[in-house]
Amino acid sequence: MPHIKLFIPGPTEVRPEILDAQAAWMIGHRMPECTELISSIRPKLRQVFQTEQQVLISASTGSGLMEAAIRNCVGKKVLNCVNGAFSERWHEIVVGNAKDNEVLAVEWGQPILPEQVTERLASGEFDAICLTHNETSTGVTNPIPELVQAVRQSPNGDQIMILVDAVSSLAGADIRFDEWDLDVLLTSTQKAFALPPGLAFAAVSNRAMEKAKTIPDRGWYFDFLTLEKYLLKDQTPSTTVVSLMYALDKQLDDILAEGLEARFARHLAMRDRTIEWGKAHGFEVFAAAGYESPTVTCFANNLHIDISGLNKFLRTRGMIMSNGYGSKLKNVTFRIAHMGDLQMSDMEELFAAMDEYLAENLD
């Protein structure tokens, strides 16, 4: 199969060196070699999450750890903050786990604002809140530090579990778990980590670990306490994705060698260039001004281009970008990912190909 360079918001482009790292000889997950591998990974993960607390490792998707966060941290009632398809998934998971909840919904393309959270938490009946840092469907980054401040200042705010989905932003955006006072911050490998899918990670606060001890029916596979028990021994409760763990170890080395500050700056520069390109052609940014994602830009299809036709053309040039997500935004928007290990030269290659298509197909 020919290589198609991915400018989609996951799975993302994976470098050959990372693919090669998976080709190491197989080992058993209870062998000392696997323990050594996990021991190498753990401190580097904490650096990327910017935390001194635990970062759990799960052989699952990010959605799996979203479910884990709900099962381990919600005892009374949870507020689901929805401004797109993936924040809506928080609500679906909450309902699927029969947790009492309310929804704070805003127009897609808009951020969740602190005053909205303050108003909804005023009743004092919530013990958790679900937030999405980077709404992949709309290209909106929610103002998490300001939202945390609103939560902590609400009734019983110091006891409210702040659960944050950073699946499409962590390792591409500056997210400070300890400094921001979060309780669960989760992500997975196939987005800004620029790895194949198959692993997910969650930084979990000491406060959240204590809360989990009070929650019945946490299950087993996604039980934070079980995951932590094995993690402290540099092990996993069940067979992990060993080949992907090799790739993770290599990629963490490379991420830290680049430097987190430099990595975040590269993502912002690619974001700014993408917006510049789109505006030069007359496309409107779908995200509200000031809340544009550093990892994926969503454009309104206000010029009514044939997005499927554009992607068909891009495939002839060895690349692909993304249509709008789901029935609500498909063909109404399109998305260009600029995350992971993509470089500015990759973006320019994409824009040159898109320029070629638009020159022939725009009236």
Set out the residue ranges of the language-model regions.
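Active-site phosphate-binding strand-loop segment of PLP-dependent enzymes
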Residues: 112-171
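Conserved active-site segment immediately N-terminal to the catalytic lysine
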Residues: 178-190
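PLP-dependent enzyme catalytic core of the Aspartate aminotransferase-like
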Residues: 1, 332-363
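Active-site C-terminal subdomain of aminotransferase-like
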Residues: 13-14, 190-276
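Conserved beta-loop-alpha segment that forms the PLP phosphate-binding cup at the N-terminus of a helix
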Residues: 52-79, 83, 87-91
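Conserved PLP-binding catalytic core of the aspartate aminotransferase-like
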Residues: 284-314
